């Protein structure tokens, strides 16, 4: 029996959603090398796997099949970075600097919470987006930024 690659399915769905909604932003699945960083940057960083596991090895159903598994959690850190000269067109208006950061914080939060993970691929049962933290400006780097934590819990169906 081949195991399903649930972690990469969840991560790919988040990355694809961000790339679709923000085609003028650079979306990274990890921190890029400094020389490769392009702005505005949306960085998804997997921080923990197996967070708050529940019902380990118990019976569960997935679609029409039943077997053993658990609720498995992933913890991501999402970073937004905007540099001084970055702008993004929002309904015909150029958003820059702090205004762009504010726009991205609200809309990235809305968009990742609206992802419809394909039920045939992975059954997400719960998710939590924490508040944006470290919101601010680094004057030496001329960067605006913010970070948040995003938790995703899914059924890890292991065997029949």
Language model: regions and residue ranges:
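Short, well-ordered secondary-structure micro-motifs within conserved domains or adaptor modules
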Residues: 37-48
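Charged, amphipathic alpha-helical segments and their flanking helix caps
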Residues: 1-34, 49-160
């Amino acid at each position: 029996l081949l195991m399903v690659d649930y972690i990469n399915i969840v991560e790919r769905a988040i990355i694809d959603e961000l790339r679709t909604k923000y085609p003028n932003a650079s979306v990274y699945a990890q921190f890029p090398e400094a020389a490769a960083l392009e702005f505005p940057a949306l960085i998804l960083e997997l921080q923990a796997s197996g967070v708050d596991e529940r019902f380990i090895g118990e019976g569960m159903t997935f679609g029409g099949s039943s077997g053993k598994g658990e609720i498995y959690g992933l913890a991501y850190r999402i970073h937004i970075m905007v540099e001084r000269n970055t702008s993004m067109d929002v309904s015909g208006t150029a958003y820059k600097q702090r205004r762009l950061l504010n726009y991205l914080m609200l809309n990235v939060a809305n968009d990742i919470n609206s992802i419809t993970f394909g039920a045939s691929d992975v059954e997400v049962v719960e998710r939590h987006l924490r508040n944006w933290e470290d919101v601010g400006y680094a004057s030496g780097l001329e960067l605006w930024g913010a970070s948040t934590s995003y938790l995703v819990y899914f059924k890890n169906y292991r065997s029949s």
